[in-house]
Protein backbone atom coordinates (compact mmCIF):
# COMPACT_ATOMS: atom_id res chain seq x y z
CA UNK A 1 0.00 0.00 0.00
CA UNK A 2 1.22 3.28 -0.96
CA UNK A 3 0.38 6.53 0.58
CA UNK A 4 0.81 9.44 -1.69
CA UNK A 5 1.67 12.00 0.97
CA UNK A 6 4.44 9.79 2.20
CA UNK A 7 5.93 9.61 -1.21
CA UNK A 8 5.62 13.34 -1.52
CA UNK A 9 7.33 13.97 1.72
CA UNK A 10 10.07 11.60 0.85
CA UNK A 11 10.71 13.28 -2.40
CA UNK A 12 10.60 16.61 -0.70
CA UNK A 13 13.09 15.54 1.94
CA UNK A 14 15.42 14.09 -0.62
CA UNK A 15 15.21 17.24 -2.62
CA UNK A 16 15.89 19.35 0.36
CA UNK A 17 18.89 17.23 1.29
CA UNK A 18 20.28 17.45 -2.20
CA UNK A 19 19.75 21.19 -2.36
CA UNK A 20 21.28 21.69 1.03
CA UNK A 21 24.27 19.58 0.13
CA UNK A 22 24.78 21.51 -3.06
CA UNK A 23 24.30 24.92 -1.44
CA UNK A 24 26.73 24.27 1.57
CA UNK A 25 30.04 25.87 0.62
CA UNK A 26 32.29 24.27 3.24
CA UNK A 27 33.52 20.75 2.91
CA UNK A 28 32.46 18.25 5.39
CA UNK A 29 34.72 17.11 8.18
CA UNK A 30 35.12 13.65 6.88
CA UNK A 31 36.68 14.74 3.60
CA UNK A 32 40.50 14.74 3.77
CA UNK A 33 40.90 15.90 7.40
CA UNK A 34 44.02 18.12 7.84
CA UNK A 35 43.57 19.28 11.43
CA UNK A 36 46.78 19.26 13.50
CA UNK A 37 46.83 16.98 16.42
CA UNK A 38 46.89 18.65 19.85
CA UNK A 39 49.30 16.01 21.00
CA UNK A 40 52.04 17.41 18.75
CA UNK A 41 54.60 19.67 20.39
CA UNK A 42 53.95 23.38 19.68
CA UNK A 43 56.81 25.88 20.16
CA UNK A 44 55.92 29.56 20.60
CA UNK A 45 58.68 32.11 19.94
CA UNK A 46 58.68 35.81 20.94
CA UNK A 47 60.21 38.04 18.24
CA UNK A 48 61.20 40.67 20.83
CA UNK A 49 63.41 38.22 22.75
CA UNK A 50 64.95 37.06 19.53
CA UNK A 51 65.82 40.66 18.60
CA UNK A 52 67.45 41.32 22.01
CA UNK A 53 69.54 38.19 21.74
CA UNK A 54 70.67 39.22 18.28
CA UNK A 55 71.66 42.68 19.54
CA UNK A 56 73.69 41.20 22.40
CA UNK A 57 75.47 38.97 19.97
CA UNK A 58 76.25 41.95 17.77
CA UNK A 59 77.43 44.15 20.66
CA UNK A 60 80.09 41.85 22.05
CA UNK A 61 81.18 39.33 19.51
CA UNK A 62 84.41 37.61 20.44
CA UNK A 63 85.93 38.20 17.04
CA UNK A 64 85.55 42.01 17.26
CA UNK A 65 86.98 42.10 20.82
CA UNK A 66 90.00 40.14 19.72
CA UNK A 67 90.50 42.44 16.76
CA UNK A 68 90.41 45.58 18.99
CA UNK A 69 93.03 44.12 21.32
CA UNK A 70 95.21 43.26 18.36
CA UNK A 71 94.93 46.83 17.06
CA UNK A 72 95.99 48.28 20.44
CA UNK A 73 98.94 45.91 20.64
CA UNK A 74 99.96 46.90 17.15
CA UNK A 75 99.83 50.62 17.99
CA UNK A 76 101.95 50.10 21.07
CA UNK A 77 104.50 48.05 19.18
CA UNK A 78 104.71 50.66 16.39
CA UNK A 79 105.13 53.50 18.96
CA UNK A 80 102.12 55.35 17.64
CA UNK A 81 100.40 55.23 21.00
CA UNK A 82 102.84 56.36 23.72
CA UNK A 83 101.77 56.12 27.35
CA UNK A 84 104.39 58.22 29.17
CA UNK A 85 104.08 60.75 31.99
CA UNK A 86 106.16 63.90 31.59
CA UNK A 87 106.45 64.49 35.33
CA UNK A 88 107.70 62.34 38.14
CA UNK A 89 104.14 61.54 39.23
CA UNK A 90 100.72 61.51 37.63
CA UNK A 91 99.35 64.06 40.12
CA UNK A 92 98.36 67.36 38.53
CA UNK A 93 98.61 69.20 41.88
CA UNK A 94 102.17 68.07 42.48
CA UNK A 95 103.21 69.12 38.98
CA UNK A 96 101.62 72.55 39.50
CA UNK A 97 103.40 72.93 42.84
CA UNK A 98 106.77 72.02 41.35
CA UNK A 99 106.22 74.45 38.48
CA UNK A 100 105.34 77.22 40.93
CA UNK A 101 108.46 76.49 42.96
CA UNK A 102 110.59 76.82 39.82
CA UNK A 103 108.99 80.19 39.06
CA UNK A 104 109.64 81.37 42.61
CA UNK A 105 113.29 80.36 42.35
CA UNK A 106 113.57 82.43 39.18
CA UNK A 107 112.11 85.44 41.03
CA UNK A 108 114.89 85.31 43.61
CA UNK A 109 113.56 83.38 46.57
CA UNK A 110 112.90 79.76 47.42
CA UNK A 111 109.57 78.40 48.57
CA UNK A 112 109.37 75.69 51.20
CA UNK A 113 106.49 74.11 53.09
CA UNK A 114 106.34 73.14 56.74
CA UNK A 115 103.86 72.11 59.39
CA UNK A 116 103.53 74.79 62.06
CA UNK A 117 101.88 74.91 65.46
CA UNK A 118 102.09 78.73 65.52
CA UNK A 119 101.59 79.99 61.94
CA UNK A 120 101.34 83.64 63.00
CA UNK A 121 104.82 83.69 64.56
CA UNK A 122 106.31 81.74 61.66
CA UNK A 123 104.83 84.10 59.06
CA UNK A 124 105.97 87.16 61.00
CA UNK A 125 109.50 85.84 61.44
CA UNK A 126 109.73 84.95 57.76
CA UNK A 127 108.53 88.41 56.74
CA UNK A 128 111.03 90.10 59.06
CA UNK A 129 113.85 88.02 57.58
CA UNK A 130 112.79 89.00 54.06
CA UNK A 131 112.65 92.68 55.02
CA UNK A 132 116.09 92.58 56.63
CA UNK A 133 117.65 90.61 53.79
CA UNK A 134 116.36 92.87 51.00
CA UNK A 135 116.23 96.19 52.95
CA UNK A 136 112.50 96.72 52.44
CA UNK A 137 112.01 98.99 55.46
CA UNK A 138 110.90 102.06 53.48
CA UNK A 139 109.86 100.43 50.19
CA UNK A 140 106.09 100.14 50.29
CA UNK A 141 105.76 98.58 46.81
CA UNK A 142 108.16 95.80 47.73
CA UNK A 143 106.30 95.20 51.00
CA UNK A 144 103.02 94.96 49.10
CA UNK A 145 104.58 92.49 46.67
CA UNK A 146 105.86 90.46 49.62
CA UNK A 147 102.33 90.27 51.05
CA UNK A 148 100.90 89.16 47.70
CA UNK A 149 103.51 86.43 47.41
CA UNK A 150 102.63 85.06 50.86
CA UNK A 151 98.93 85.08 49.97
CA UNK A 152 99.61 83.44 46.62
CA UNK A 153 101.57 80.45 47.85
CA UNK A 154 99.41 79.71 50.92
CA UNK A 155 95.89 78.39 51.29
CA UNK A 156 92.98 80.66 52.16
CA UNK A 157 92.80 79.16 55.64
CA UNK A 158 96.20 80.73 56.38
CA UNK A 159 95.40 84.20 55.02
CA UNK A 160 94.22 85.55 58.39
CA UNK A 161 97.56 84.69 59.98
CA UNK A 162 99.39 86.32 57.08
CA UNK A 163 97.40 89.56 57.36
CA UNK A 164 97.89 89.70 61.14
CA UNK A 165 101.64 89.14 60.80
CA UNK A 166 101.91 91.76 58.03
CA UNK A 167 100.03 94.41 60.06
CA UNK A 168 102.27 93.80 63.07
CA UNK A 169 105.31 94.00 60.80
CA UNK A 170 104.20 97.42 59.53
CA UNK A 171 103.59 98.62 63.09
CA UNK A 172 107.06 97.52 64.15
CA UNK A 173 108.63 99.22 61.14
CA UNK A 174 106.76 102.44 61.92
CA UNK A 175 107.85 102.33 65.58
CA UNK A 176 111.47 101.69 64.62
CA UNK A 177 111.41 104.62 62.21
CA UNK A 178 109.91 106.90 64.88
CA UNK A 179 112.52 105.81 67.42
CA UNK A 180 115.31 106.54 64.96
CA UNK A 181 113.93 110.04 64.33
CA UNK A 182 113.61 110.73 68.06
CA UNK A 183 117.14 109.52 68.75
CA UNK A 184 118.47 111.70 65.96
CA UNK A 185 116.68 114.75 67.38
CA UNK A 186 117.98 113.99 70.85
CA UNK A 187 121.54 113.72 69.59
CA UNK A 188 121.18 117.07 67.82
CA UNK A 189 119.73 118.67 70.95
CA UNK A 190 122.55 117.22 73.03
CA UNK A 191 125.11 118.76 70.68
CA UNK A 192 123.47 122.19 70.84
CA UNK A 193 123.14 122.02 74.63
CA UNK A 194 126.77 121.01 74.99
CA UNK A 195 127.93 123.95 72.86
CA UNK A 196 125.72 126.34 74.82
CA UNK A 197 127.03 125.01 78.13
CA UNK A 198 130.61 125.44 76.96
CA UNK A 199 129.93 129.04 75.92
CA UNK A 200 128.29 129.78 79.27
CA UNK A 201 131.26 128.29 81.12
CA UNK A 202 133.70 130.44 79.20
CA UNK A 203 131.66 133.58 79.91
CA UNK A 204 131.44 132.87 83.63
CA UNK A 205 135.18 132.20 83.77
CA UNK A 206 135.99 135.51 82.11
CA UNK A 207 133.59 137.28 84.45
CA UNK A 208 135.16 135.82 87.56
CA UNK A 209 138.64 136.56 86.30
CA UNK A 210 137.73 140.20 85.80
CA UNK A 211 136.51 140.55 89.37
CA UNK A 212 139.78 141.39 91.05
CA UNK A 213 140.39 143.63 94.03
CA UNK A 214 142.96 146.41 93.65
CA UNK A 215 143.64 150.11 94.04
CA UNK A 216 142.57 152.53 91.38
CA UNK A 217 145.31 154.76 89.92
CA UNK A 218 143.11 157.88 90.43
CA UNK A 219 142.01 157.24 93.95
CA UNK A 220 143.16 155.10 96.85
CA UNK A 221 139.61 153.80 97.02
CA UNK A 222 138.09 152.00 94.09
CA UNK A 223 134.55 151.07 93.33
CA UNK A 224 133.67 147.98 91.36
CA UNK A 225 130.52 146.28 90.36
CA UNK A 226 129.95 142.55 90.66
CA UNK A 227 129.38 140.60 87.53
CA UNK A 228 125.94 139.14 87.05
CA UNK A 229 125.16 136.36 84.67
CA UNK A 230 121.69 135.25 83.74
CA UNK A 231 121.14 131.98 81.96
CA UNK A 232 117.95 130.66 80.51
CA UNK A 233 117.03 127.53 78.67
CA UNK A 234 117.52 129.24 75.33
CA UNK A 235 120.20 131.90 75.85
CA UNK A 236 122.99 132.59 78.34
CA UNK A 237 123.93 136.26 78.73
CA UNK A 238 126.79 137.70 80.75
CA UNK A 239 127.44 141.28 81.71
CA UNK A 240 130.93 142.74 81.43
CA UNK A 241 132.45 144.37 84.50
CA UNK A 242 133.37 148.02 84.45
CA UNK A 243 135.56 149.66 87.04
CA UNK A 244 134.78 153.32 87.97
CA UNK A 245 137.02 155.33 90.33
CA UNK A 246 135.42 157.29 93.15
CA UNK A 247 136.56 160.68 91.77
CA UNK A 248 134.71 160.08 88.57
CA UNK A 249 131.53 159.38 90.50
CA UNK A 250 131.89 162.69 92.39
CA UNK A 251 132.41 164.64 89.17
CA UNK A 252 129.34 163.04 87.65
CA UNK A 253 127.33 163.98 90.71
CA UNK A 254 128.38 167.65 90.48
CA UNK A 255 127.54 167.84 86.78
CA UNK A 256 124.14 166.44 87.51
CA UNK A 257 123.43 169.09 90.12
CA UNK A 258 124.49 171.91 87.74
CA UNK A 259 122.17 170.65 85.11
CA UNK A 260 119.26 170.50 87.52
CA UNK A 261 119.91 174.09 88.77
Swiss-Prot record:
Boundaries of every OVATE domain copy: 112-172
Pfam families linked: Ovate
Phenotype of null mutants: No visible phenotype under normal growth conditions.
Keyword Transmembrane helix belongs to the record: no
Expression by tissue: Expressed in roots, cauline leaves, shoots, flower buds and siliques.
Chain intervals with Low complexity compositional bias: 11-28
GO cellular component: nucleus
PROSITE patterns reported in the protein's UniProt record: OVATE (PS51754)
Top-rank lineage group of the source organism: Eukaryota
Record InterPro entries: Ovate, Ovate_C
Keywords: Nucleus, Repressor, Transcription, Transcription regulation
Broad class of where this protein is predominantly found: nucleus
GO biological process: negative regulation of DNA-templated transcription
Subcellular localization(s) per the UniProt record: Nucleus
Stretch list, region Disordered: 1-28
Other facts noted in the record for this chain: Plants over-expressing OFP15 show small rosette size, late flowering, reduced fertilization and blunt-end siliques.
Self-association state and partner proteins as the record states: Interacts with BLH1 and BLH3.
PANTHER family to which the protein is assigned, alphabetical: TRANSCRIPTION REPRESSOR OFP15, TRANSCRIPTION REPRESSOR OFP7-RELATED
Function, as annotated: Transcriptional repressor that regulates multiple aspects of plant growth and development through the regulation of BEL1-LIKE (BLH) and KNOX TALE (KNAT) homeodomain transcription factors.
UniProt protein name: Transcription repressor OFP15
Organism for this UniProt entry: Arabidopsis thaliana
Gene from which the chain derives: OFP15
Amino acid sequence: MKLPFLNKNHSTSSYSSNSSSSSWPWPSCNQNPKTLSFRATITFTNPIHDQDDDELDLLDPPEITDSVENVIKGLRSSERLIFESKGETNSILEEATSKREEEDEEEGFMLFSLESDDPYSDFKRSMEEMVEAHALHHDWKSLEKLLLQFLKVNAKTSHRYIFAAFVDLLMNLALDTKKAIINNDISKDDGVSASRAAAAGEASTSCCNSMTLGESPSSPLSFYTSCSSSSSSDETSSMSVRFLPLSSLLEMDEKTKEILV
